């Protein structure tokens, strides 16, 4: 079975949240590895936020899902990949998910992510 999720976000929303709450916002949403990879590049952070939302939709995770349990990093070839932890991982195991593929993109104003999970 295939499970899909898509999300789009205005990059300015991530910028506004970072301006309002600073590092506290970033540390609540992103893992240390994601923050290190993105180096405060807002389009990249926004795309990873969209990926987290897309995973939540694909796996039908609860609305209070911890974003830090969903991590989007890059493989050595640059392709994005998803790592799950905690409750997100438990749900994926329950669904029999064997693979999660993610595609990220952004332009000046928006970032988008598409996730396909398969058992």
Swiss-Prot record:
Location (main, coarse): cytoplasm
Keywords assigned: Cytoplasm, Fatty acid biosynthesis, Fatty acid metabolism, Lipid biosynthesis, Lipid metabolism, Magnesium, Metal-binding, Transferase
Positions bound to Mg(2+): 7, 53
Named cofactor requirement(s): Mg(2+)
Taxonomy, superkingdom: Bacteria
Protein's UniProt keywords contain Ligase: no
EC number: 2.7.8.7
UniProt subcellular location: Cytoplasm
Family from the record: Belongs to the P-Pant transferase superfamily. AcpS family.
HAMAP family in the record: AcpS
Function: Transfers the 4'-phosphopantetheine moiety from coenzyme A to a Ser of acyl-carrier-protein.
The protein's name: Holo-[acyl-carrier-protein] synthase
The species this protein was found in: Dehalococcoides mccartyi (strain ATCC BAA-2266 / KCTC 15142 / 195) (Dehalococcoides ethenogenes (strain 195))
């Amino acid at each position: 079975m295939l499970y899909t999720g898509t999300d789009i976000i205005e990059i300015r929303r991530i910028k506004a949240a970072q301006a309002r709450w600073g590092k506290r916002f970033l540390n609540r949403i992103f893992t240390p590895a994601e923050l290190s990879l993105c180096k405060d590049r807002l389009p990249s952070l926004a795309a990873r936020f969209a990926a987290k939302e897309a995973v939540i939709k694909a796996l039908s995770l609860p609305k209070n899902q911890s974003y830090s349990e969903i991590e989007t990093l890059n493989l050595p070839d640059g392709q994005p990949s998803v790592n799950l932890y905690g409750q997100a991982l438990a749900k994926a195991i329950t669904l029999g998910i064997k693979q999660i593929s993610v595609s990220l993109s952004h332009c000046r104003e928006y970032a988008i992510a598409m996730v396909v999970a398969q058992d």
